[in-house]
Amino acid sequence: MFTDFYFIYSKGKLSATGCVYAGLQEQSSPSNGVWWQANLIGRYNITDALSVTGRIEHFNDPDEVQIVPVTGVKGFQSYSSSLGLNYKVAENVLLRLEGRTFFSDKYVFVRGEEQVKNSNTITSNITIWF
């Protein structure tokens, strides 16, 4: 079973979205696998072509239905936050650069050969739509 709830807000140069996803996976073990995720995303349009985006989210999967930590730790729970810069190159092309940090109370991430409780990434992408 899967369900979600979300909202979308937009006024002028500011927009926000938020959502909560939840799932229940039948398992052969005594408990069914329940997982959920929630996030909040805000965007501010500096110009028609340039915007900045911030995001916070939480993911909880104690029964490892969606995510199994590679570190061998039982269950997965993590928070994350990010800040991104978007540049609209053309009407249907977007460039994005984003810095993101993940936090957990368990050693679910790997850095080199070490198990750690947080992870930092910088990603970029090109989105093209038709």
Residues of each region from the PLM?
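Hydrophobic, lipid-facing positions within transmembrane beta-strands of outer-membrane proteins
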Residues: 1-5, 36-40, 79-83, 120-124
